[in-house]
Every structure is written in structure tokens, then in C-alpha cells.
């Protein structure tokens, strides 16, 4: 009987306690590690709190009107013939219009400022990385360094990264939440993405578009190094790798669908491999 008496309080306590359980969740998007992700978080916050300017007053007025004009409230004047108020009309039309205009201008500017193809202004020489999505793994090609990796991306801190992306299979989506923009990749097409990491650390990237049975394991590691010296020492090690990727036969073997792929490094790359993959899909020769 005692339990039944306090049942509602116990349930409320358990419900509120669930909030503290999310303390262990990863809040990647709200804790960015790159300039683009920081700007996107700012856009999210501005849009969210601007819309609260409408939502909060509406909730407040709903509660206020219910209490003030309830049937049992005899202290207020009953005026059934009331039908219009210039002040109310001004508020309920004017404020939403102002907010919509503000969000329109703000969104338009933000979309252009954060265009994935827009180069990042920096005094540091950018690094080019070609990305090919395969079933179910990511191939990262460093064309200037003549190396490639499977499911491993290493970049120096505060260095603009120019990604050229395509798919060697079905349509997919490339996303590193800590650094910013998600972008779709399609076979036979090339798209661009510019990112930069402003904090050291190891982050996760993944496919955010369903692409088959191995989709859930199509993830890769992103390591942000402290300087270019460490990066180029790593490059020299990979250039000595025993695994080669200097022919289309080797690429086609790599492209065979496989799940839960381990990190792998390649040296001695086929010249212009990225463009050849696109050309093969389009059935043209280079």
C-alpha cells in the first residue's frame, strides 16, 4: 500500500534521474574541434534561440490565458463581444515576420560562408586528399605524397585540407562530426570539401548514408598531429609500405565488397588513380 501511495513520486524521480544518464553520451557536434564545425554550431545556436523567441511566449500565453480566462475566475470581466486589438495583431504578425526575415538573411549568408567548396583562408599550405568510398571502406589517397590508406586519415593541426571525393560503388556520405560538413559522394562524379582541425586529438568519421549490409562498420579514424614534422615522418614510413596500389587490378581487388575492414597502408600509387576511377564509371578513357 505504501508503494502505491508513493508510486507517482517514484516514477517522476526515476524519469528525472534518466537525464543524468546522458552524461556519458558523446556530444560531438556541440563540442567541435574544427573551424567549420564551430561556425556550424554557431548557426545552430542562433537559429535555435531565435525560434525560442516565438515558442516560449506562445507556451507562456497558453498557460496565462487558460488560468486568466477559466470559467471559475469571477474576478475578471467577461466580454463576449470583444473581437479585435491592434496591439495583439501587431505582436502576433510583426514579431514572426521580423524573425523570419532575420533567419532568412542569416541562413543565406551562412550557407554561402560555409559552402563546402569554399577554400579556407590560411597562411599554411593546404594538403590535398582524394577520397573514394568503397564497399564498405574508405580509401584515402594523398596524391602529392604518393601514398594511400584504408580507414585512416592523418592531418596536421591548423592546416586546410582539400578533399576531392567520389564513390567507387554506390552513393555514400562522408562525415567527420568533429570537423564539420557532411557531404554526399556519387559514382562518376567529383565533389569537394574543405575542412580544418584546430585541436589535437583522435576523432571518428563515418558513412552517414545507408549503402548496404556493411554500412554500420564503414568508419574511419582521424588523427590530428601537432605539427608537419610528425606528419611527414608518418608519410615517409607509409612510402616504405610493402603494399602497392599501382594498377587497376590491385584497386579492383581492394574494391571487392568486404565488411569491418582493418586499417591498411599503400605506397607506389597508380598515377591519377582518383580520376581513373571516375572515368571507369563513366566508361571513358584517360
From Swiss-Prot:
The chain crosses the membrane at residues 45-67, 86-108. The keyword Electron transport applies. Its main location: membrane. It holds the Pfam family COX_ARM. CDD domains: CuRO_UO_II. Belongs to the cytochrome c oxidase subunit 2 family. Cytochrome bo(3) ubiquinol terminal oxidase is the component of the aerobic respiratory chain of E.coli that predominates when cells are grown at high aeration. Has proton pump activity across the membrane in addition to electron transfer, pumping 2 protons/electron. Heterooctamer of two A chains, two B chains, two C chains and two D chains. This is Cytochrome bo(3) ubiquinol oxidase subunit 2. The gene is cyoA.
Amino acid at each position: 500500500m505504501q508503494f502505491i501511495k508513493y508510486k507517482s513520486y517514484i516514477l517522476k524521480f526515476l524519469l528525472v534521474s534518466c537525464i543524468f544518464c546522458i552524461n556519458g553520451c558523446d556530444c560531438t557536434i556541440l563540442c567541435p574541434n574544427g573551424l567549420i564545425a564551430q561556425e556550424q554550431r554557431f548557426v545552430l545556436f542562433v537559429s535555435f534561440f531565435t525560434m525560442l523567441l516565438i515558442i516560449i511566449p506562445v507556451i507562456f500565453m497558453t498557460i496565462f490565458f487558460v488560468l486568466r480566462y477559466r470559467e471559475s475566475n469571477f474576478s475578471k470581466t467577461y466580454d463576449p463581444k470583444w473581437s479585435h486589438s491592434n496591439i495583439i495583431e501587431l505582436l502576433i504578425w510583426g514579431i514572426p515576420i521580423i524573425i523570419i526575415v532575420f533567419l532568412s538573411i542569416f541562413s543565406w549568408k551562412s550557407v554561402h560562408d560555409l559552402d563546402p567548396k569554399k577554400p579556407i583562408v590560411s597562411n599554411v599550405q593546404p594538403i590535398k586528399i582524394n577520397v573514394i568510398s568503397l564497399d564498405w571502406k574508405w580509401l584515402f589517397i594523398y596524391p602529392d605524397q604518393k601514398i594511400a590508406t584504408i580507414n585512416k586519415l592523418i592531418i596536421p593541426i591548423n592546416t586546410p585540407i582539400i578533399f576531392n571525393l567520389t564513390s567507387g560503388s554506390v552513393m555514400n556520405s562522408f562525415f567527420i562530426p568533429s570537423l564539420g560538413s557532411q557531404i554526399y559522394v556519387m559514382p562518376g562524379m567529383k565533389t569537394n570539401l574543405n575542412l580544418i582541425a584546430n585541436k589535437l586529438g583522435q576523432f571518428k568519421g563515418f558513412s552517414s548514408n545507408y549503402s548496404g549490409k556493411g554500412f554500420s562498420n564503414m568508419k574511419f579514424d582521424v588523427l590530428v598531429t601537432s605539427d608537419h614534422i610528425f606528419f611527414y615522418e608518418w608519410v615517409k614510413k607509409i612510402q616504405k609500405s610493402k603494399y602497392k596500389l599501382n594498377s587497376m587490378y590491385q584497386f579492383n581487388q581492394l574494391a571487392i565488397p568486404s565488411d569491418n575492414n582493418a586499417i591498411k597502408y599503400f605506397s607506389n600509387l597508380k598515377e591519377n588513380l582518383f580520376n581513373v576511377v571516375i572515368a571507369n564509371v563513366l566508361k571513358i578513357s584517360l
